[in-house]
Structures are given as structure tokens and as C-alpha cells.
């Protein structure tokens, strides 16, 4: 009440003095502006920006692997953990698009050990950190890459024409390229070994299943995932929402699209993988060729086909 009285007295004084030349109208206007914010703070709060976080969903998805029905099928020493700028437990490689489903990960050698005690933000892992830079892991892959360089084919033909037939040029080139591959792999040596991963920054997790157990694992996993409900197209969307997970889930999971999809999530590329289900904001994908499962944070997905 005292504040209200002060405002009334102030305004009365201003009205009384408005005919005098010394009246400070700007001061009065500034007072009114300040009055809105300081005396009525609840009416002029800045809108809160919703932050998209996959931590809870990724934790719930990983917790499924603790169940007795799923744990025996999982190789906990063949994991990869993908964030925006680094990968633990794998390198990036090229994809053979002729034989989907495929991914752009090498063999997995990271370890998922356990959930950190008394900490909801971290999981205990073991593995090496690498930059998400594709490396050729086969001689054929490197040869194909070098063969696309202009002038290389002509140079090889010229060398082949001048060397004696007793010299096996192919064997020499293979040895040179093999040495180059070894150098590239050595250059991609991990930056460091790590023991913990932040669930707040994980974009995707990949892990291997024993090939003979893949179908059994898929069947058991489906029991624990969210039930699928088809939805009709609804054009009344909340386009102001800064999170995209709802629209992506509607497209990947809630619609009658083909179950085989291609997904790009940061540095992870998956072609022709199967949509197995979801756990809240984590989409679960399967790769039957490599007996590999992917937990992908929906908000990290950039492109879909």
C-alpha cells in the first residue's frame, strides 16, 4: 500500500506542476517504464526458452540393457559413443551403398561399464577418443580414393611402360599403399583414453549383438520399447517450438512409412537401417548386416531418407 501511495503522490505532483516550465517530463516517462518492471514483475517476465535435452531418454534406453532378458545378448566391450565433435570406441569409414543396411563406423571397441554411482549425468565407459574423420581401413578403399585424383591413372601407365617386365609394379604399389594406410591409422591414434561420458552430450550410442542372437534380441527389445501408435497427418503444428523431436518422431515412428530408413545424426550415417522403436526421445535402430543396434537422440538427427 505504501508503494501505491507513493506512486499516487508522485503522479499528483506531476499533474500539479505540469504547467511549470521546470517539469521533467522525461523523468516522469522513465519512472512509468521502471514502474512496470519493478512493481509488476510477474506481468513482464521474459519467456523461457525450452532447452532440448536427451539425457533422461538416453539413460532410460541404456538402462534397458540391464534387464535379464536383454543383457546376455549384448557385448559390452563393443560399444561406440558419438558426440558432436568426438567418437569413443570407433573410427569413421566409408559406406558401401550397394549393400544396406550399413553405417560409417569401423569395428567397435569401446566398453560400457556401468552407470555412475550417485550421478545422473555420467556413465562409466572405457575407450579412446578420436576425431570424427573418415579413414580408409582397406587397401581397396584407398586405391579407389587415389584413383579419382586427376592424372594418377596416366602417371601409373607411364611408369608401367618404362619399367622392366620383371618388376612387379602392382606388388610395389600395394606395399606403398599399405604403408600409407598404416600411417593414416597411426595418425588417427586416439587423443586420450577416457573413463566417463556425459549423457548430456551423447548424440548416439552403437553396440554389437552376437550375430546368432540378433533376431532374439530384437524380439525381446520390442517388449520394453514405447508402443507404436500411427497418427494421421496434422498440419496444426507448433512451429514456434525450438525442439524438433516431435516432428521427427512423427515422421520416423508414428507414420506409415517404410520401416527401412536412412538417418544422418551429426557424424553418424546410417543407411537402410530398421526402425525398431523408441524410448521417449531416443529412436532405436537396427542393422541386421552387422548385428548392430543404435540409440540415437532424436534432436540430433539432421537428415532423413
Swiss-Prot record:
It is found in: Spore coat; Spore, Perispore. Its main location: other. One of its GO terms (biological process) is sporulation resulting in formation of a cellular spore. It comes from the Bacteria. Disruption phenotype: Inactivation of the gene produces changes in the ultrastructure of the spore. In thick-exosporium spores, the absence of the gene leads to thickening of the coat. Inactivation of the gene leads to a significant decrease of the spores with a polar appendage. According to Permpoonpattana et al., disruption mutant exhibits a major structural defect in spore assembly, with a clear misassembly of the outermost layers of the spore coat. However, Pizarro-Guajardo et al. demonstrated that mutant forms spores with a similar overall ultrastructure to the parental wild-type strain. Keywords: Sporulation. Contributes to maintain proper thickness of the spore coat. May contribute to the formation of polar appendages. May play an important role in assembly of the outer layers of the spore coat. This is Spore coat protein CotA. It comes from Clostridioides difficile (strain 630).
Amino acid at each position: 500500500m505504501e508503494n501505491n501511495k507513493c506512486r499516487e503522490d508522485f503522479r499528483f505532483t506531476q499533474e500539479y506542476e505540469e504547467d511549470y516550465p521546470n517539469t521533467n517530463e522525461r523523468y516522469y516517462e522513465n519512472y512509468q517504464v521502471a514502474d512496470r518492471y519493478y512493481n509488476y514483475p510477474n506481468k513482464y517476465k521474459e519467456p523461457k526458452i525450452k532447452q532440448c535435452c536427451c539425457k533422461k531418454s538416453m539413460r532410460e534406453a541404456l538402462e534397458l540393457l540391464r534387464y535379464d532378458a536383454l543383457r546376455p545378448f549384448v557385448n559390452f566391450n563393443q560399444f561406440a559413443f558419438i558426440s558432436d565433435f568426438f567418437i569413443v570406441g570407433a573410427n569413421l569409414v566409408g559406406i558401401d551403398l550397394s549393400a544396406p543396411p550399413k553405417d560409417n563406423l569401423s569395428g567397435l571397441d569401446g566398453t560400457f561399464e556401468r552407470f555412475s554411482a550417485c550421478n545422473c549425468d555420467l556413465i562409466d565407459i572405457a575407450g579412446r577418443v578420436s576425431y570424427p574423420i573418415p579413414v580408409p581401413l582397406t587397401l581397396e578403399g584407398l586405391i579407389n580414393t587415389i584413383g579419382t585424383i586427376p592424372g594418377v591413372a596416366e602417371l601409373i601407365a607411364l611408369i608401367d611402360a618404362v619399367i622392366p617386365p620383371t618388376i612387379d609394379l602392382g606388388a610395389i604399389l600395394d606395399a606403398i599403399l599399405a604403408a600409407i594406410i598404416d600411417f593414416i591409422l597411426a595418425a588417427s591414434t586416439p587423443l586420450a583414453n577416457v573413463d566417463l561420458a556425459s549423457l548430456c552430450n551423447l548424440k548416439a550410442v552403437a553396440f554389437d549383438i552376437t550375430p546368432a542372437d540378433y533376431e532374439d534380441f530384437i524380439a525381446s527389445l520390442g517388449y520394453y520399447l514405447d508402443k507404436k501408435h500411427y497418427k494421421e497427418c496434422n498440419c496444426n503444428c507448433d512451429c514456434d517450438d525450438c525442439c524438433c523431436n516431435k516432428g521427427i518422431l512423427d515422421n520416423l515412428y508414428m507414420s506409415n512409412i517404410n520401416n527401412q530408413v536412412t538417418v544422418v545424426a551429426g557424424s553418424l550415417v546410417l543407411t537402410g537401417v530398421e526402425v525398431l522403436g523408441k524410448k521417449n526421445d531416443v529412436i532405436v535402430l537396427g542393422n541386421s548386416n552387422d548385428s548392430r543396434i543404435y540409440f540415437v537422440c532424436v534432436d540430433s538427427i539432421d537428415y532423413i531418407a
